[in-house]
């Protein structure tokens, strides 16, 4: 049993000692079975939320009505959720009501995919009622039970299925795929924010190529913000190794380059996904300096976006980042005498004092002239030299 589970075992033992059932569930169990790095460890129990709160000193109520309580244990936090059954779903995204139960198999039955519906006991025994281990062996993404029922309960599950394709390198099982084609329009009931989370995870997956192609082939792409009508561009984008880029703004910038949108449309597209303003701004900066130019003035104007543009260019051309070349670009950038106007050894206030003039457009124009001369290597970035240069300029 991995260390992540060992650290959480006292919670299971504490619940069991009080007469309750308790198991590890979800993604951590899946990743353990697949010998992958384990993320958050979640626990399912027959204890009610109130009983969980009584048993543990430090808890946080994050949704008791849905059965979930956070337990703080040593330096970790664990989601402890009561076994539950769900009534009919409303709006294709949440159940009308939740009923607490005492059956683990009934609890696991309501989960989205077989690979996520496995549990593990305190002794390390795998409990797999729905063939998750078999599907992992076959590298298949399959829903628990009828796929149409699962997708009508929560339409986001269609995106989750394709996202796991990208992360795990699995294929969509035939019936699950057919249900996506049939029910894809239900995704309209899901908030943009939830779609964005899944789409960004998909782009980060090592098998995003197959996942993007599946989204196009099933028509799922048509239900995503701003992508209907861009099927061909998305097929071209599918061959790009998005997972090789570290920052989310870099992945969005790369996607924009494949879509071929003008700056105004590109910004509107990013806003449709309800991305943070900072991410939008950075992505727009990257595409504005792409393809990267390595002249001093161009590098200066590009700033930090230069490196993102260089990486995207390498990946588009060679599918890999040449770290040595990237270091050479970074070295060239570091050799710039200034990285921003603030780095000039003279300020607008200095100029006003020197000229004995009030503020006006002339200050920005003069700073721009100094900036150009410093970048071109014609003028050292020292106040004394700049003043001398300005004096000689005045005499011309």
UniProtKB/Swiss-Prot annotation:
CDD domains according to UniProt: NT_ClassII-CCAase
Catalytic activity: a tRNA precursor + 2 CTP + ATP = a tRNA with a 3' CCA end + 3 diphosphate; a tRNA with a 3' CCA end + 2 CTP + ATP = a tRNA with a 3' CCACCA end + 3 diphosphate
Residues binding ATP, per UniProt: 27, 30, 111, 154, 157, 160, 163
This enzyme's EC code(s): 2.7.7.72
GO-annotated biological processes: RNA repair; tRNA 3'-terminal CCA addition
EC top class named in words: transferase
Ligand binding (Mg(2+)): 40, 42
InterPro entries in alphabetical order: Bact_CCA-adding_enz_type3_sf (IPR050264), CCA-adding_enz_C (IPR032810), CCA-adding_enz_firmicutes (IPR023068), NT_sf (IPR043519), PolA_pol_head_dom (IPR002646), PolyA_RNA-bd (IPR032828)
Purpose: Catalyzes the addition and repair of the essential 3'-terminal CCA sequence in tRNAs without using a nucleic acid template. Adds these three nucleotides in the order of C, C, and A to the tRNA nucleotide-73, using CTP and ATP as substrates and producing inorganic pyrophosphate. tRNA 3'-terminal CCA addition is required both for tRNA processing and repair. Also involved in tRNA surveillance by mediating tandem CCA addition to generate a CCACCA at the 3' terminus of unstable tRNAs. While stable tRNAs receive only 3'-terminal CCA, unstable tRNAs are marked with CCACCA and rapidly degraded.
Family the UniProt entry places it in: Belongs to the tRNA nucleotidyltransferase/poly(A) polymerase family. Bacterial CCA-adding enzyme type 3 subfamily.
PANTHER family reported in the protein's UniProt record: CCA TRNA NUCLEOTIDYLTRANSFERASE 1, MITOCHONDRIAL (PTHR46173:SF1)
HAMAP family: CCA_bact_type3
Note: A single active site specifically recognizes both ATP and CTP and is responsible for their addition.
Protein name: CCA-adding enzyme
Organism (species): Bacillus velezensis (strain DSM 23117 / BGSC 10A6 / LMG 26770 / FZB42) (Bacillus amyloliquefaciens subsp. plantarum)
Gene assigned in the entry: cca
């Amino acid at each position: 049993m991995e260390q992540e589970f060992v650290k959480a075992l006292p919670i299971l033992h504490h619940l069991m000692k009080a007469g309750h059932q308790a198991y590890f569930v979800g993604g951590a169990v899946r990743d353990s079975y697949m010998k992958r790095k384990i993320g958050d460890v979640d626990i399912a129990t027959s204890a009610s939320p109130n009983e969980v709160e009584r048993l543990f000193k430090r808890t946080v109520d994050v949704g008791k009505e849905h059965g979930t309580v956070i337990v703080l244990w040593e330096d970790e936090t664990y989601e402890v959720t009561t076994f539950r059954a769900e009534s009919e779903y409303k709006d294709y995204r949440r159940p009308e009501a939740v009923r607490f139960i005492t059956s683990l198999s009934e609890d696991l039955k309501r989960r989205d995919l077989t690979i996520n519906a496995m549990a593990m006991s305190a002794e390390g025994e795998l409990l797999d009622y729905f063939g998750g281990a078999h599907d992992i062996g076959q590298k298949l993404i399959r829903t628990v039970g009828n796929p149409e029922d699962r997708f009508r309960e929560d339409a986001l599950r269609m995106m989750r299925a394709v996202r796991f394709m990208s992360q795990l390198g699995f294929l969509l099982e035939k019936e699950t795929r057919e249900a996506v084609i049939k029910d894809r329009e239900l995704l309209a009931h899901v908030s943009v924010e939830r779609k964005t989370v899944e789409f960004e995870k998909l782009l980060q997956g090592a098998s995003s190529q197959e996942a993007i192609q599946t989204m196009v082939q099933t028509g799922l792409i048509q239900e995503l913000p701003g992508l209907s009508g861009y099927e061909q561009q998305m097929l071209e984008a599918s061959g790009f190794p998005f997972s090789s880029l570290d920052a989310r703004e870099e992945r969005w910038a790369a996607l924009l380059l494949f879509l071929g949108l003008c700056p105004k449309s590109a910004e509107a597209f990013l806003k449709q996904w309800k991305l943070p303003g900072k991410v939008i701004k950075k992505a727009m900066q990257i595409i504005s300096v792409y393809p990267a130019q390595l002249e001093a003035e161009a590098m200066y104007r590009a700033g930090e976006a230069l490196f993102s543009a260089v990486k995207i260019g390498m990946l588009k051309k060679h599918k890999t980042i040449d770290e040595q070349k990237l270091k050479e670009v970074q070295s060239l950038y570091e050799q710039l005498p200034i990285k921003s106007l603030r780095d000039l050894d003279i300020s607008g206030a200095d100029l006003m004092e020197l000229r004995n003039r009030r503020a006006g457009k002339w200050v920005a124009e003069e700073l721009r002239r100094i900036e150009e001369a410093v970048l071109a290597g014609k003028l050292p970035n020292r106040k004394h030299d700049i003043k001398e240069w300005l004096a000689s300029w005045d005499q011309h």
